[in-house]
Amino acid sequence: MLFRSQDRNQAAGSFIAMLYLTGARKSEVLLAKWEHVNWEDKTLFVPLTKNGKSRIIYLSTLAIDILEKLPRIAGNPYVFASQHIRCQGKPIGEPRCAYERVLQKAGIEDRDEVCFHTARHSVASALVSSGQYSLYDVKAQLAHASIQSSQRYAKLTSERSRNISEGLSSMIQA
């Protein structure tokens, strides 16, 4: 696994993992507070999104496990809390160096082309290309304001096109 709790910077690694596990925006994860985590419902409440609305992010068992292993810093309400003395009570800064290490371990060569927002693109593309989720599912998961934002990920693979063709044949022959 690319994200280990024993890494030098557990908060940074966990932050990066949460981006890929939720498809949330960088700011939604960085500004998450412990009071917004509902352990029973496995959700994270985001009081203010880019779209000016609140939203609920549903957390997987793995995401909950990652959150449970994070230390709570006294006097700091943030899930991804800075441990630096001069940043007491604030979230961590953008962990670009940690992200660089993750990208290197993953064998990604064009690291200059990859940013934190790329995680959202990766999540959306993975959901759409799996064939298990609709564009409306992607819209909801990523909190897109409109379906048009989600449509950019709707690229048909040759395998998917072949499956559609076979499915049509099966329907006609039935």
Residue spans for each PLM region:
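Basic, Lys/Arg- and aromatic-enriched nucleic-acid-binding interface segment
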Residues: 1-26, 30-31, 40, 50-54, ...
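N-terminal core-binding DNA-recognition domain of tyrosine site-specific recombinases/integrases
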Residues: 7-9, 53, 86-94, 110-115
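Short, leucine-enriched amphipathic alpha-helices that occur as contiguous helical runs
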Residues: 11-13, 63, 92, 120-121
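C-terminal catalytic core of tyrosine-transesterase DNA break-rejoin enzymes
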Residues: 14-17, 21-28, 118-145, 152
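Short, polar N-cap/turn motifs at the start of nucleic acid-interacting alpha helices
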Residues: 36-43, 112-113, 132-152, 163
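Catalytic-site neighborhood detector that most strongly recognizes the C-terminal catalytic loop/helix
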Residues: 48-52, 86, 142-167
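Non-catalytic DNA-binding core/recognition domains of DNA-processing enzymes
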Residues: 59, 95, 99
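C-terminal secondary-structure termini that scaffold catalytic or DNA-interacting sites
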Residues: 69, 76, 81-87, 163-174
